[in-house]
Amino acid sequence: MNAIVDTGYLVALLNRNDEHHDWATGLAEKLTLPLLTSEAVLAETAFHLQSSTYVLKLLQEQVLQVAFECVSHLEHLQDLAIGYADRHPDFADLCLIRMSELYPRHVVVTVDDDFRVYRRNKRQAIPLLSPPKK
């Protein structure tokens, strides 16, 4: 399965103490490499893990691929930021919404419930993989 990955998934995958770690590791076996993401997601992930080491290793091993250059999509990102201003999306979320438009055959893997509200191409639900609700 082709996937675009969000910060929460990567943190859960790499942090054994994360509440979604078992879900993330089980899902990892089903995802096709490389997993697509943005630099914003990588920065957030390194911040939450308090280390860049794991992120860099996943890039070097081609588990992750940066497949989005934000400067090429600034106008669209701005439109998304304005359209979802009431939800206060972070920059990484805006990038992933746009990536889901650019890679329509990929699912977004996230623990973020806001992606249930976000839409690609203004009206289409974004295909998601998220942990089950407890």
Describe every region a protein language model picked out.
Residues 112-116:
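Low-complexity, intrinsically disordered Gly/Pro/Thr-rich segments
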Residues 3, 22-88, 98, 102-106, ...:
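PIN-domain endoribonuclease scaffold, especially VapC-family toxins
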Residues 6-7, 38, 111:
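A secondary-structure boundary/capping signal
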Residues 1-18:
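Metal-dependent nucleic-acid phosphoesterase active-site entry motif
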